[in-house]
Amino acid sequence: MRRASRDYGKYLRSSEEMGSGPGVPHEGPLHPAPSAPAPAPPPAASRSMFLALLGLGLGQVVCSIALFLYFRAQMDPNRISEDSTHCFYRILRLHENADLQDSTLESEDTLPDSCRRMKQAFQGAVQKELQHIVGPQRFSGAPAMMEGSWLDVAQRGKPEAQPFAHLTINAASIPSGSHKVTLSSWYHDRGWAKISNMTLSNGKLRVNQDGFYYLYANICFRHHETSGSVPTDYLQLMVYVVKTSIKIPSSHNLMKGGSTKNWSGNSEFHFYSINVGGFFKLRAGEEISIQVSNPSLLDPDQDATYFGAFKVQDID
């Protein structure tokens, strides 16, 4: 009995020594060290994500409206008025011409009340869709990015358009007479005329970006005997490409061309064409205009009298 007691005591001491060894793991509750908070995404990634979600929201809203109009037209084509179609067209034109400052273009003030309400409803639908996609907490900071035009955020995600312009003469506003005048009425969106990232204001083409530009002008003069006799026997038919600076009021002739013609003969028809072009360094805010002599003899066709510019490269 005593021997058994001693053996049991040795067993207990041996168990205690083995349990206190460094190799035995702790059996109590484990408390892992708190992990460091995840770093916040960089602003650029957050902005890119928001722009992507914005594009998704815009696409979903536009598709929904298109499907609504389609099925509505299928059910009753007479229910969709031409006013609704014109409103969509005018709203799109308003934002397409946002970079132009000519008073003849579409502007917020020229929209009728019905179109303005449609624009506001569309804007509200886009904002609601974005809030549904990104959540109310993340959307709370979005209005700061959506200040100004309701399509500004979408435009910011696009690369800036290369500046160019091709302008054709407005035949209804050609001055009369034989004296030298500045042509102040050009088309920018009719026929072959087009403009992008440049401004047409009071007949002058304004540069919005510094750079090297290629400028060109083609002016045609013509006269038919049915139009009566020419003012004089000898005509000086000239064209001038003029640069004007707004910051420092001054004007300089960049190019000119022309000739003196005798149109007093027995010919039934007279025609003369002038074409000039060249590279020039232009600064933002400078304006290009066209001056001609004998404006009453101008050929009003879009393939005869026009001028334009396009950016070739940046200024180093």
UniProtKB/Swiss-Prot annotation:
| Classification via InterPro entries | TNF_dom, TNF_ligand_10/11, Tumour_necrosis_fac-like_dom
What is the name attached to this protein's record? Answer: Tumor necrosis factor ligand superfamily member 11
Give UniProt keywords alphabetically: Cell membrane, Cytokine, Cytoplasm, Developmental protein, Differentiation, Glycoprotein, Membrane, Receptor, Secreted, Signal-anchor, Transmembrane, Transmembrane helix
**What disease is recorded for this protein?**
Deficiency in Tnfsf11 results in failure to form lobulo-alveolar mammary structures during pregnancy, resulting in death of newborns. Trance-deficient mice show severe osteopetrosis, with no osteoclasts, marrow spaces, or tooth eruption, and exhibit profound growth retardation at several skeletal sites, including the limbs, skull, and vertebrae and have marked chondrodysplasia, with thick, irregular growth plates and a relative increase in hypertrophic chondrocytes.
Function recorded in the entry: Cytokine that binds to TNFRSF11B/OPG and to TNFRSF11A/RANK. Osteoclast differentiation and activation factor. Augments the ability of dendritic cells to stimulate naive T-cell proliferation. May be an important regulator of interactions between T-cells and dendritic cells and may play a role in the regulation of the T-cell-dependent immune response. May also play an important role in enhanced bone-resorption in humoral hypercalcemia of malignancy.
Q: Where is this region: Disordered?
A: 1-42
Phylogenetic lineage = Eukaryota, Metazoa, Chordata, Craniata, Vertebrata
GO aspect biological process, one term = negative regulation of transcription by RNA polymerase II
Q: SUPFAM superfamilies, from UniProt?
A: TNF-like (SSF49842)
What are the recorded GO MF terms, alphabetically? cytokine activity; identical protein binding; receptor ligand activity; tumor necrosis factor receptor binding; tumor necrosis factor receptor superfamily binding
Q: How does it assemble?
A: Homotrimer. Interacts with TNFRSF11A and TNFRSF11B. Interacts with FBN1 (via N-terminal domain) in a Ca(+2)-dependent manner. Interacts with TNFAIP6 (via both Link and CUB domains).
Q: Name one Pfam family in it.
A: TNF
Post-translational modification summary for this protein: N-glycosylated.
* Ranges of biased composition (kind: Pro residues): 31-42
